[in-house]
Amino acid sequence: MLRGAIWDLDGTILDSMSAWDHVGENYLRNQGIEPEPDLDEAIATMSLHQAADYFIEHYGVKQTRDELIKSAVAIVDDFYRYEAQLKPHLKEFLAQLHETGVKMCIATATERSLVEAALARCRVLDYFSEIFTCSSVGAGKDEPTIYREALNFLGTDRPNTMVF
């Protein structure tokens, strides 16, 4: 029986993948740096902290990690605050899970302020008891850390917890 649900945000809850398609490229070009053709693949599973470190080490970006993250978040900020939409029929599904007592949280690479803004605007934030970000757990989604922390927070057992 389903007791817990750990949700990804971009492309699962929100139709928001396109917002991130060229953030890295746009950021580097704004800095006067031409990105390599495989940049999107290189940073796809990285947290913002990991991507910032990669840009500093690989491209010689002069901003600090925090400055770089702030610049990247600013590129997508308006999209999350004013445009990002829920995937079709998701609101009804979340309501159904909530009504049956399924505990839910989010595990995402997106910064918390953007997650909260979009979900509050879409009126689904209250369905989730916590938001775990790669930045807050200190690891990208290519590692199990974020999912383990989410599972521990929910207090549900693995066989009865679904990752969406």
What is each model feature region?
Residues 8, 12, 108, 143:
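Conserved G/P- and acidic residue-centered "switch" motifs that form tight phosphate/ATP-binding loops
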